[in-house]
Regions:
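Generic recognition of short, well-ordered alpha-helical interface segments
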Residues: 22, 80-84, 95, 128, ...
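Predominantly a Rossmann-like dinucleotide-binding segment in NAD(P)-dependent oxidoreductases
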Residues: 7-13, 18-111, 165, 250
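Conserved loop-to-helix N-cap of the C-terminal "lid" that shapes the substrate pocket in Rossmann-like
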Residues: 79-82, 203, 227-233
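C-terminal helix-rich "cap/oligomerization" subdomain common to oxidoreductases
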Residues: 2-7, 198, 208-258
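Glycine-rich, aromatic-lined ligand/substrate-binding cores of catalytic
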Residues: 84-87, 92-100, 105-154, 160-163
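C-terminal glycine/acidic-rich active-site capping loop/insertion
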Residues: 62, 91, 118, 123, ...
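Glycine-/small-residue-rich active-site loops that bind phosphorylated ligands and cofactors
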Residues: 19, 136, 235
Length: 258
């Protein structure tokens, strides 16, 4: 796909949907501007619970395509939601994961697909972090939480509460940034369709990605953060492959391709 795209000179996008949220974009721009200082720690959690009701029932398990290797490939949890967590880490920080070490959970020995796992990552600039993804986190719905800690401050965003971006500073009350206010970046404001105080959600995030693609197709100026492109897609696939390999080879460190 990558070589075909380079020859065709067309536009390619991956719907890593959560990058379309205005406050996720604001988080990215604040980190780029140095609001946190040097990044010291990154923690991304993506927890769901829906497979917990499936994994213990053989009949349900047989009828769930994500748990069938012939339909979903080499991974369930990491391939389904772990890739979103991985992309969010790179999107908001601007860092690139260079190495990883994965420990996956299959619950039952005869289950061929991962349904839970932890991935230690080493990024550019020597930054270390962790990606935790689970589809057996009982009671969780769609809990994607991204936390980035720097020497000066920390930022946290929660997918289930996308209109809030939390700014954490030592010895100060937690700050809450919201969409639509003039203190936000142009990238964030461009993705905001309603006045402050009017909640926006997942369909708006999708629309922001499509809007960026439309600008690219029409040859209009656009910010590279408006939609994930081929590079993000290829890195996501490499992430899945290396996570599975790391676990299968005894939880060893694996390098990601640049």
């Amino acid at each position: 796909l990558k070589s075909t795209l380079e020859l065709s000179h067309t536009v390619f996008a991956v719907t890593y949907t959560y990058t379309g949220y205005p406050m996720v974009r604001q988080m990215s721009k604040m980190i780029e501007a140095g609001a946190l200082g040097k990044i010291q720690k990154v923690d991304v959690q993506y927890f769901q619970g829906w497979i917990n009701t499936v994994i213990h029932d053989e009949e349900k398990k047989k009828n769930t395509w994500r748990l069938q290797p012939e339909k979903s490939g080499i991974s369930c949890c990491m391939g389904d939601i772990g890739t979103h967590a991985f992309d969010m880490l790179e999107y908001v920080t601007g860092l690139r994961v260079e190495q990883l070490l994965a420990d996956l959970n299959f619950v039952y020995e005869d289950n061929k697909m991962d349904v839970d796992g932890n991935v230690l990552v080493r990024c550019t600039d020597g930054v270390k972090g962790v990606i935790r993804a689970s589809q057996i986190a009982t009671g969780e719905e769609n809990s994607l939480i991204v936390k980035v800690y720097g020497e000066k401050a920390g930022l946290k965003c929660e997918q289930e509460n996308p209109n809030y971006l939390y700014l954490m500073e030592e010895g100060k009350p937690m700050g809450v940034l919201k969409p639509g206010h003039t203190y936000n970046s142009d990238l964030s404001l461009d993705g905001t369709k309603l006045p402050p105080g009017h909640p926006e959600g997942i369909f708006d995030a999708m629309g922001n990605i499509y809007k960026g693609v439309a600008r690219a197709v029409k040859g209009e100026p656009y910010d590279k953060r408006e939609f994930p492109g081929m590079s993000a897609g290829v890195r996501g696939m490499n992430f899945i492959e290396q996570v599975i390999a790391s676990h299968a080879e005894g939880n060893v460190c694996k390098k990601l391709e640049n």
